[in-house]
């Protein structure tokens, strides 16, 4: 089972990672100014993770596939790592779909 891990950046802003059961980070959030905003972002990932239409499949400037998960309002709520192949990207999306909805939250900022 996956988990969300809330962390702080050096500038004091909050972000979260969705970590799969094997310890691999499969989604990273944008930065948030407050912890409640980051928690709201986690709830948004949980709510949108199972909807394939919320995944924006992209390619980086160096040709590596990745994806963004978007909320209903179109805002990016999480970004994947860069993958070596489109199949790898699809596996990453499947992992978010299966891990996010029931994931616990671990707060490392306390």
Which role does the model predict for each range below?
Residues 1, 107-110:
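Intrinsic disorder/low-complexity detector
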Residues 3-9, 13-21, 26-32, 41-45, ...:
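A structural feature that tracks compact, well-ordered secondary-structure segments
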Residues 94-95, 101-104, 108:
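Mixed-charge, glycine-accented linear interaction segment located at domain edges/termini
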């Amino acid at each position: 089972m996956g988990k969300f891990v809330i962390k702080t950046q050096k500038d004091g802003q909050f972000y979260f990672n969705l970590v799969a059961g094997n310890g691999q980070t499969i989604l990273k959030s944008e930065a948030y100014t407050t912890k409640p905003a980051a928690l709201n972002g986690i709830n948004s990932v949980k709510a949108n993770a199972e909807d394939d239409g919320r995944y924006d499949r992209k390619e980086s400037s160096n040709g590596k596939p990745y994806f963004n998960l978007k909320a209903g309002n179109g805002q990016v709520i999480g970004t994947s790592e860069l993958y070596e192949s489109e199949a790898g990207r699809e596996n990453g999306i499947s992992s978010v779909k299966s891990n996010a909805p029931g994931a616990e939250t671990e707060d490392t900022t306390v």
